[in-house]
């Protein structure tokens, strides 16, 4: 029997289609452009590869620290839509500015900001799944999100790749082609997010509302909020996990 998505599930999946374009950009075109900027600044290959690794690690640490806190806050304090929207806009605007900066240092800084915001938006996005679908459909909907995300992200990627490869034949410079490519991905990301933003499920009840209901225990997300300090401390200071930063 064919699995049929309902309207809200489709809108949830569309965000995966949008943000996956940014993921593909990070894995393909973005390192090439950073290589170009670093080479223009006279930085050796060894150094610019190291700097790229440091920037990626910095974004990972930021998400590891802020992810649990923002995730709990979005679930228990009625801020889900606000946190999701802010993360989305910071990530998309960072993507736009990445394409037009001519400084490798600013490029790395913007990369850390954009990638962190992108990852934090996913924390809130994933938490929406139980509100978008039922438990027995969650696995299928999540799988559809991954599948359509990869397929849909190919559209802006192919257009961006054509611009980067054949920029000289259409009268553009390398920097202009990159700027248009990054702008294209950011616009795609935002446009694919609009249906979900417009129909975002109702916010979770604030913490005080749970406490005011007789006999109502605090939800798991609130309990996790008060447990984020020690787990985060253990992750950051557990030596065996440091290899993940390389």
Language model region names:
Residues 140-164:
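Glycine-rich segments within core transmembrane alpha-helices of 12-TM secondary carriers
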Residues 156-168, 186-205:
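C-terminal membrane-cytosol helix-exit motif in multi-pass small-molecule transporters
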Residues 64, 85-103:
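C-terminal ends and interior cores of transmembrane alpha-helices
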Residues 110-148:
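Cytoplasmic helix-loop-helix junction between adjacent transmembrane helices
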